[in-house]
């Protein structure tokens, strides 16, 4: 079985090392980094992953490079780990090199921001492509040294995937067999891809905290940070409360989707419940969203995206962060669009989205161009 991983970032690196612990899996990594590719080509391409208990797992992927034809040759599965804003260009780049003589299972980890719609649009006419996505990353990964080492944080107890509505039961069965072969945690199949699209995650979490840190009336609205801080260990009370409001609105979108489409999306649970089920005893105090975020050991030490203040002392939020370009420009934009079409009211999400677009000034704004124009009517 050959797995091609697109992206040599934290998730791509960690998955490559973990997959190669299984001798029956051929792993190729397609990267845009000429440095990482050259290091592998020189023979010095041993990748490492440091586990939470201090063990070091090592592996050398079978291919690491910038050539999509080499990376995708005879691939059975393609895992896309790039952020949402990079996925359209990537799919266009790899499309000509996908095998045509067998089924190819193309999935995104995680599969949020409407990946099923994006992939179906870019890869239209390719009947052998099976589109799927994973609800969340299987593990937290951080402290990446590109092409060398990454640290592995908390792991999900169970993994959940969904396929595009067009896919067959036979394709679903084949996908599940493949995923349960390459992942240690049990993999479960969801009924509808909207269960992934509406999973409460980064599109709710990071923007809510950003707004509470630097939005209107926030402590750092008009001054830089004195020191680095962590997304979750240092999450302010206001951020947790705003996140709860956004999560309630996401549930309203879920209920409206169920009513309009006649489907069951009950697996889309409130965020606090999702986190408790995902991280269990790694959470020190799960009584409130605030205490949960600050005491989840799987989240400990994850830094907020701060960079040196170009206008003086201190630190400021990095405008190049995925929190803006992925979670807001794609994740929140999609939720706002879905809410409008479903006539669901989402004042907190819309408030953050409008503020972030104004604050940043250079975000892709409006409905992502791959959302079907006739959704939800034609769904």
UniProtKB/Swiss-Prot annotation:
Gene3D superfamilies: N-(1-d-carboxylethyl)-l-norvaline Dehydrogenase, domain 2, NAD(P)-binding Rossmann-like Domain. SUPFAM superfamilies: 6-phosphogluconate dehydrogenase C-terminal domain-like, NAD(P)-binding Rossmann-fold domains. Keywords: Plasmid. Pfam families: Octopine_DH (PF02317). Disulfide bonds: none annotated. One of its GO terms (molecular function) is oxidoreductase activity. InterPro entries: 6-PGluconate_DH-like_C_sf, 6PGD_dom2, NAD(P)-bd_dom_sf, Opine/Lysopine_DH, Opine_DH. This is Uncharacterized protein y4xO. It comes from Sinorhizobium fredii (strain NBRC 101917 / NGR234).
């Amino acid at each position: 079985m050959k797995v091609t991983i697109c992206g040599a970032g934290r998730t791509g690196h960690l998955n490559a090392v973990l997959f190669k612990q299984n001798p029956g899996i051929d792993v190729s990594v397609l990267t845009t980094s000429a440095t990482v590719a050259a290091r592998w080509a020189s023979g010095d391409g041993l990748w490492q992953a440091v586990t939470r208990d201090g063990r070091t797992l090592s592996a050398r992927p079978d291919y690491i490079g910038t050539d999509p034809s080499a990376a995708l040759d005879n691939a059975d599965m393609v895992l896309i780990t790039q952020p949402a804003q990079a996925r359209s260009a990537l799919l266009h780049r790899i499309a000509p090199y996908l095998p045509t003589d067998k089924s190819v299972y193309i999935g995104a980890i995680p599969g949020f921001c409407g990946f099923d719609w994006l992939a179906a649009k870019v890869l239209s006419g390719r009947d052998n492509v099976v589109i799927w996505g994973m609800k969340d990353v299987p593990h937290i990964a951080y402290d990446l040294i590109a092409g060398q080492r990454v640290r592995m944080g908390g792991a999900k107890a169970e993994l959940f995937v969904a396929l595009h509505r067009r896919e067959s039961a036979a394709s679903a069965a084949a996908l599940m067999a493949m995923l349960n072969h390459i992942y240690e945690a049990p993999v479960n199949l969801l009924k509808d891809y909207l269960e992934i699209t509406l999973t409460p995650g980064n599109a709710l979490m990071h923007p809510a905290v950003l707004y509470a840190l630097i939005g209107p009336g926030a402590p750092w609205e008009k001054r830089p940070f004195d020191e680095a801080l962590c997304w979750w260990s240092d999450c302010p009370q206001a951020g947790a409360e705003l996140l709860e409001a956004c999560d309630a609105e996401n549930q309203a979108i879920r209920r409206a989707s169920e009513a309009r489409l006649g489907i069951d999306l009950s697996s889309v649970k409130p965020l606090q419940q999702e986190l408790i089920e995902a991280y269990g005893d790694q959470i020190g105090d799960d009584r409130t969203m605030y205490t949960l975020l600050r005491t989840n050991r799987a989240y400990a030490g994850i830094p907020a995206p701060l960079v040196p203040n170009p206008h003086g002392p201190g630190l400021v939020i990095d405008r190049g962060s995925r929190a803006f370009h992925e979670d807001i420009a794609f994740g929140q934009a999609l939720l706002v669009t879905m809410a409008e079409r479903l006539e669901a009211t989402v004042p907190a999400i819309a408030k953050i989205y409008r503020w972030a677009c104004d604050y940043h000034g250079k975000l892709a704004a409006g409905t992502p161009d791959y959302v079907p124009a006739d959704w939800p009517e034609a769904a």
